[in-house]
A protein has these predicted regions:
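Inward-facing hydrophobic residues that define packing positions of alpha-helical scaffold repeats
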Residues: 17, 22, 29-30, 71-72, ...
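Residue-level signature for tetratricopeptide repeat
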Residues: 15, 50, 57-58
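Hydrophobic/aromatic side-chain positions at a characteristic register within alpha-helices
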Residues: 5, 17-18, 59
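Terminal, low-structured helical/coil segments at or just beyond the last alpha-helical repeat
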Residues: 95-120
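TPR/TPR-like (Sel1-like) alpha-helical repeat modules
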Residues: 62-82
Length: 120
């Protein structure tokens, strides 16, 4: 988890994501992502969440090709993150992305939720 993360804004992005407002979640995370060192772990963390949100946005708009490309990017980025699975459910998100890549039909009955527990 980035040390300088604005936890209030991150929580708002999570709320957008979990409410199915994937475009809004992506926009919010992207604002922070742009300021991260390219290819740093923080960069990969935010890129993974952004790509996951955009993949689900593409799915909602019947863009199968875009969904598949962004799911792959999301998984690649999330797999580059070694943060402990303490504040965000990274292992569950990675697992869901793997399953959705193998069988896109799961998106019809199971969408991921980001579980975020801010630090004390």
């Amino acid at each position: 988890m980035p040390d300088d993360l604005d936890h209030r804004l991150f929580a708002e992005s999570v709320e957008h994501f979990n409410a199915g407002r994937y475009f809004e979640a992506h926009e919010s995370w992207e604002d922070d992502w742009r300021h991260r060192a390219h290819r740093s772990e923080d960069w990969h963390f935010l890129k993974g969440l952004i790509c996951l949100a955009v993949a689900l946005h593409h799915h909602a708009n019947a863009n199968e090709r875009g969904r598949g490309m962004l799911l792959r990017r999301a998984l690649d980025s999330l797999e580059a993150v070694t943060y402990p699975d303490t504040w965000v459910n990274l292992d569950e998100l990675r697992d869901w992305a793997r399953r959705a890549l193998a069988d896109p039909q799961i998106i019809e009955h199971e969408v991921p939720r980001v579980v975020y527990v801010p630090p004390p």
